[in-house]
Amino acid sequence: MALKLGATVVPTDHFATWTDPVSWWPRLVAEVLDPLRHGRDAHYRRVEWPGGLPRLGDLVHVPVPDVLIIEGVSAARRSIAPHLDEAIWVEVPDPAERLRRAVERDGEASRAHLRRWQAFERGWFAVDGTKDRADRIVTPD
């Protein structure tokens, strides 16, 4: 979708850690959303995982885009909803399939963390009502 739209993508994975899945949001707002909203390029340090431990890593430059996609869990959270042009919910209904895909992406060593993450997601989405506010629901192949 990003390629088709010529969009810039900022993944929430660049901010979240296993132990801090959502409270990093003010950093995303201050370092990315506020500058872009005011027509200025944005810069942020992405979370990197040397030796399996999170730390702030390389500086990422985000020029003012025509289309910005914030991708990941909590990207369409209730607090940002009034500022979104569109919220897209990506639906993979089977939890085992979601886990399989995530382990394929992140490696077998991440399986236990991913299971805890999925439990967090279920609770987050239930409280936040994210899917109910989505403008579009898509199911990947």
Identify what each model region corresponds to.
Residues 8-70:
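Conserved nucleotide-sensing/catalytic segment adjacent to the nucleotide-binding pocket
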Residues 14, 92, 140-141:
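Active-site donor-binding loop signature of nucleotide-sugar glycosyltransferases
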Residues 54, 58-105:
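ATP-dependent NMP and nucleoside kinases share a basic, alpha-helical "lid"
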Residues 13, 85, 135:
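Receiver (REC) domain switch/active-site residues of two-component response regulators
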Residues 31, 35, 101-108:
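Conserved AAA+ ATPase "sensor/coupling" helix adjacent to the nucleotide-binding pocket
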Residues 7-9, 87-89, 137:
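Conserved beta-strand scaffold positions in the cores of enzyme catalytic domains, especially
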Residues 1-4:
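Glycine-rich phosphate-binding P-loop
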Residues 77, 107-141:
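Small-molecule kinase domains that catalyze NTP-dependent phosphoryl transfer to phosphate-bearing small molecules
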